[in-house]
Amino acid sequence: MDRGRCANMLKSLQRTLAKCQKSPSTNHWQCFKRNFTSIRATKYPGRSNSTFHYWPWFAASTLLATSLYYRDRPVQNDDKTDAFPSHTESIQVDSSVSDFPLTITALNFPVSTTFKLLGYGQRHVTFLRFKVYALGLYLAENDENLVSDTLNETYLHKYFLDVDDSKTPKENLARLLKRDDSKSVMMIDDLLDSGMRMLAKITPVRNTDFKHLKEGLVKTISKHPDVANNKDTLAKGLSELNDAFSRKGSVRKNDDLIIELLANGALQFSYHDSKNNEFEVMGVVNNQLVGKFLFSQYLCGEKSPSPQAKKTTIDKLITLL
């Protein structure tokens, strides 16, 4: 092979790569395809005096094109806990439904403030091992400071004796949140009592109905460890939940149930018909235990409906300590 021609070929490819990386367009793969067609093809002699047309160009360009192509592919997160990519506006929670937005605002959903994604995962039916819905858990943007204001060094030494003095307060709090189910429930419940606003986005991965969604919420709430001490109050709250979920009928795959935890502890339920892009505010549950127990189960404890969503959410909360 002519080394001079090979060197020129590589220089041309390097110039193409640099040009596409600096392109204002976000799709570097399309940029490469446009520019590569203008590069002059060259012949190189092969073995036994035969001639291979363009093969060095093809090999090198394939490597380059593959790099650019996968650089522009959307992020996929089925059963993964990767950090949120900073350059995207959404993330794939499950491949069978639409990506979840990293930010939810009153401009695109019937919510009271701006929410940022904390964590995500899927809900599985344990004994059958099939997925039921994708779940995203969000925190009000203006309430991020409540995490460090509530779970701080003073809180740590006031309520816990097993503090490792060789660790920082943040490391001790992180250990308790991640490794001690009973203490994590106490910590998350105190955090929710601070008035922290949250939001859950539930997107079915198969066709279902409002009855099944409501039953799932009731089961999740009923698994909170403090239910036995609050039976009467919670019973009234579940009655409110039943009224808020009075709508009947089917819920299509990829529709959304939006559950907003308000500052006063109330829950607002909204439904998004994704096919027609229509929203409906279904109702409000004012009983504070319902909202507190529901989001507590999402965030902590051994009976969380989505361990993946719990893990990714706790990991994100720890960064806010």
From Swiss-Prot:
Gene3D superfamilies: 3.50.70.10. It is found in: Mitochondrion. GO terms for cellular component: mitochondrion. Keywords: Mitochondrion, Transit peptide. GO terms for molecular function: intramolecular lyase activity. Residues 1-72 form a transit peptide. This is Altered inheritance of mitochondria protein 18, mitochondrial. Belongs to the AIM18/AIM46 family. PANTHER family: FATTY-ACID-BINDING PROTEIN 2. InterPro entries: Chalcone_isomerase, Chalcone_isomerase_3-sand, Chalcone_isomerase_sf.
